Amino acid sequence: MSETYVLKADLRTRVGKGSSRELRRNGQIPAVIYGDKQEPLAIAVSYKEIFYKIHGGGFKTTVATIEVDGKKIQVLPKDYQLDPVRDFPQHVDFLRVSAKSVVHVNVPVHFKNEEAAPGIKRGGVLNVVRHDVELIVPANAIPEALEIDLSGLEIGDSVHISAVKLPKGATPAIQDRDFTIATIAAPAGLKSEENAEGAAEEAKDGE
């Protein structure tokens, strides 16, 4: 699980475009905390802190503690809006979580030991089908990433979700099939040779 962090926030007494613009001029951005059968809470958080958290990676898979109005609220970032031109954060949605919370979260996939995959050594290409996997997981057990070991994989081999070790209590959101995460594809040269051989065999058969 990623290391948690603390965000200090202020309550927002006014909402709307005008107040949001004023917040941004003062180095803050609007945000909301919702969920856990409680009323949404409008807050303002530091633009600088959110910018670095978003662009530093792992933002939506890390539980945070927001300190606001004398309270500490555990949250999971669920969504954010960026300026379409400059990629500056404009707004953040936080979901309230507790020790018993189970959440849906997209976890990035990381690959290791490419040098130990014979298929890649022979010129094969790692074809990533899914760069992240949606998990249903306890909020206190969200992994930073799913690590996939490519050791021993040959050209034509695939990695399916059933081969991935998940954290305790975690399950894939997709349950109806053993979906593919990555394959070792043949290099273009090898494909061309195979196609040429196949065409030659067909020509012989037609004689």
From Swiss-Prot:
Q: List the disulfide bonds.
A: none
Name the CDD domains for this protein.
Answer: Ribosomal_L25_TL5_CTC
By its UniProt entry, which InterPro entries does this protein fall under?
Rbsml_bL25/Gln-tRNA_synth_N, Ribosomal_bL25/Gln-tRNA_synth, Ribosomal_bL25_b-dom, Ribosomal_bL25_C, Ribosomal_bL25_long, Ribosomal_L25_dom, Ribosomal_uL5_bac-type
Q: Name one GO molecular function term.
A: 5S rRNA binding
Pfam families, A to Z:
Ribosomal_L25p (PF01386), Ribosomal_TL5_C (PF14693)
Keywords of the record, alphabetical order, are: Ribonucleoprotein, Ribosomal protein, RNA-binding, rRNA-binding
Its BP terms in the Gene Ontology are: translation
- Is RNA-binding among this UniProt entry's keywords? yes
**One cellular component term from this protein's GO annotations in UniProt:** cytosolic large ribosomal subunit
Subunit record text: Part of the 50S ribosomal subunit; part of the 5S rRNA/L5/L18/L25 subcomplex. Contacts the 5S rRNA. Binds to the 5S rRNA independently of L5 and L18.
Identify the HAMAP family for this entry.
Ribosomal_bL25_CTC
Role played: This is one of the proteins that binds to the 5S RNA in the ribosome where it forms part of the central protuberance.
- Family assignment from sequence similarity: Belongs to the bacterial ribosomal protein bL25 family. CTC subfamily.
Q: What is this protein called?
A: Large ribosomal subunit protein bL25
